[in-house]
């Protein structure tokens, strides 16, 4: 019953790699789980949390159109999906955590920290109890730091690689992609520092770290799948 967490900044390919690993090992693929279920537990619409993506303001309108498109696609493809593993939810854009660290001004900022973290912990531990999952989510490796049969993987990549990934995937101009990468990473760092007093690139929080500037996604997925074999052998 292995559980694999994959964490990394936007543009490292965590979602793609996670999907590959899940397919290879026949595991459930879990992406926007924490915000989806945490929002349900605390009674906040998940759309409200996702919408804060638009608060990366310098190109808000373009991101707003992107968010709307992804939400429509998710609704179409995930209409009959399960709350944890619904198809289509993995296509939603990455969360910024800006409201949760006080950078934004929306509903998420008003959530009590203790309530939010308790919800995050419950969801993560429920998933771990079920087993057989690849979890894409910032903070999952901290919540399940000492959990049995769990492999924590960190991803990193040079700025130019991450910027190019966004340009190719989201059709951003280079300047837009660069701003997006920088602001989301800063928000991610602030979030982890606030709630876990940790930096996302600290190697001690993972079983392994992979430099996506040095390998492709297929190789990374194969390395992770091989390492996960130790959890079941």
Ranges and model annotations:
Residues 39-132:
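ATP-dependent small-molecule kinase phosphotransfer cores
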Residues 1-4, 131:
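Pre-Walker A (Motif I) flank of P-loop NTPase domains
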Residues 57, 61-65, 79, 173-217:
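Small-molecule kinase domains that catalyze NTP-dependent phosphoryl transfer to phosphate-bearing small molecules
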Residues 121, 217-225:
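Short, amphipathic alpha-helical "lid/cap" segments that border enzyme active or binding sites
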Residues 5-19:
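Glycine-rich phosphate-binding P-loop
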